[in-house]
């Protein structure tokens, strides 16, 4: 469906990564349009890269001083795994940040060494199928379950959706479902029993549905020829950069993820976008008018032709009467950055970090720990790299909700349990005072897609198309994926569609969901 003309006045609500991407791309696609970027809080959303000055005496007696970067939100990016990966890398290139890319090759310890924390200590997660043959309780359980999976019959009739916990228990058994809870904690900070398999790990649903077995489906592939061709074309468009990323396991940005949101905000403003963040950018109401939308702001009404909402669905529900916006819960995640005056090798094994299955060694509601110093070297510690240790403790999520607990009212309450967790896990820290501890309480930051999410998005798409008639689009983690790649892709698609004069809801992918 097309609209009579591309909108000349556009408001983007929300200045996180999705909203910034939408505003930046719209300012290029529609250079004659008047674009407003509105957010009642800070620019950047959940992306937050903090700089800290530290000074300490090393174990060798050397006085060291310098600036380090700590992340309160996302910190690494995957260079594969769907159409969002090339979209993100293209955005970084177009924003002029290609020189800031810090690639982590597939041979790097951070790519090969990832751990689970079990009651018996840290267990390395097998990075390859062959490694499953090596002795460890987790690998042995996975190997036996994978070997038996092709012989399990799929249910009839096949479910349209189910929880992640139900699926893993049914296909691989309770032990593997328990191990899988750690990965759900790391990605969604959610209870696997509440999370939609089809929306969170759709490739597993498709593999079993098509081939009767997840293992056989993964071996044969489930992507359509059209999807494969589109992804190849997207990578080819990136030329040499698209080729180089084939050797990367992941990548980060020098200076942190905040370098990207800052650059997008500055570029959008330079392109003429009216950026209002803080109290002046808080939207209190949306009202459809004859051929546009009236937005209520503290300074008065703002008339636009089109609204792109990058707000969380529950926040949008306060402004627009649309179905299903409050159907999914969101989890609150505590993030505690801790810096010690010891080299990483004196504290933890080389690698990315560890995740914790439900209830395993999690008396302090810990979900996992990132070994920032070895996971993402070269991203912002300068001459101090290798001489101090940065760790990030992730806490809460389902432990402050589905598992029965409640979130603390202040981020300061996270410090004691985070330090206690680290001291139990790494004995070297029991007699070492940290240089820096910075707690963050990210309230309702990650949506939990409840089973049936895709069908509900189809209904929401239909309602937006019918009731808003080309005047509203939605983007962000609340709809089509929680990763930074997913967020960028959704914003890119909406901006491109509006630039072509199309009426886009942002939910076209779910229009044929069954």
Which ranges hold each PLM region?
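Glycine-rich FAD pyrophosphate-binding loop
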Residues: 27-61
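Mid-domain catalytic core of redox enzymes
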Residues: 29, 279-404
């Amino acid at each position: 469906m097309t609209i009579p003309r591309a909108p000349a006045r556009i408001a983007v609500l929300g200045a996180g990564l999705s909203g910034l991407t939408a505003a930046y791309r719209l300012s290029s696609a529609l250079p004659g349009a008047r674009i407003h970027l509105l957010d009642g809080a800070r620019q950047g959303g959940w992306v937050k890269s903090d700089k800290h000055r530290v000074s300490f005496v090393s174990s060798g007696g050397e006085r060291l001083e310098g600036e380090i970067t700590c992340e309160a939100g996302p910190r690494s990016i995957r260079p594969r795994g769907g159409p969002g990966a090339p979209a993100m890398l293209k955005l970084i290139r177009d924003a002029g940040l290609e020189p800031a890319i810090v690639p982590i090759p597939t041979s790097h310890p951070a790519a090969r060494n990832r751990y689970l924390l079990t009651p018996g200590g840290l267990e390395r997660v097998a990075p390859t199928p062959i490694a499953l043959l090596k002795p460890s309780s987790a690998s042995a359980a996975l190997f036996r379950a994978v070997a038996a999976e092709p012989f399990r019959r799929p249910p009839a009739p096949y479910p349209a959706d189910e929880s992640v916990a139900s699926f893993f228990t049914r296909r691989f058994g309770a032990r593997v479902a328990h191990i899988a809870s750690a990965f759900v904690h790391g990605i969604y900070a959610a209870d696997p029993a509440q999370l939609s398999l089809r929306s969170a790990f759709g490739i597993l649903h498709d593999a079993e549905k098509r081939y009767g077995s997840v293992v056989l489906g993964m071996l044969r592939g489930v992507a359509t020829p059209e999807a494969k061709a589109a992804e190849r074309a997207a990578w080819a468009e990136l030329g040499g950069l698209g080729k180089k990323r084939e050797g990367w396991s992941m990548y980060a940005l020098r200076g942190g993820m905040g370098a990207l949101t800052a650059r997008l905000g500055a570029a959008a403003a330079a392109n003429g976008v009216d950026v209002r963040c803080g109290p002046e950018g808080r939207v209190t109401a949306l009202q459809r008018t004859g051929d546009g939308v009236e937005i209520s702001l503290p300074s008065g009404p703002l008339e636009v032709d089109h609204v792109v909402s990058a707000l969380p669905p529950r926040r949008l529900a306060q402004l627009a009467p649309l179905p299903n916006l409050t159907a999914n819960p969101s989890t609150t995640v505590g993030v505690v950055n801790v810096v010690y005056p010891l080299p990483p090798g004196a504290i933890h094994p080389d690698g990315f970090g560890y995740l914790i299955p439900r209830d395993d060694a999690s008396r302090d509601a810990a979900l996992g720990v990132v070994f920032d110093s070895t996971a993402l070297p070269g991203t912002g510690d300068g001459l101090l790299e290798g001489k101090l240790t940065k760790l990030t403790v992730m806490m809460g999520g389902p432990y402050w909700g589905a598992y029965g607990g409640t979130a603390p009212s202040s981020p300061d309450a996270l410090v004691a349990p985070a330090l206690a967790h680290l001291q139990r896990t790494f004995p070297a820290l029991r007699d070492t005072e940290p240089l820096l501890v910075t707690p963050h309480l990210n309230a309702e930051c990650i949506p939990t897609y409840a089973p049936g999410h895709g069908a509900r998005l189809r209904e929401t798409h239909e309602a937006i198309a019918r009731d808003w008639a080309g005047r509203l689009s939605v983007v962000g983690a609340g709809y089509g994926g929680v990763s930074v790649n997913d967020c960028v892709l959704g914003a890119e698609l909406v901006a491109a569609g509006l630039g072509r004069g199309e009426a886009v809801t942002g939910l076209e992918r779910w229009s044929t969901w069954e």
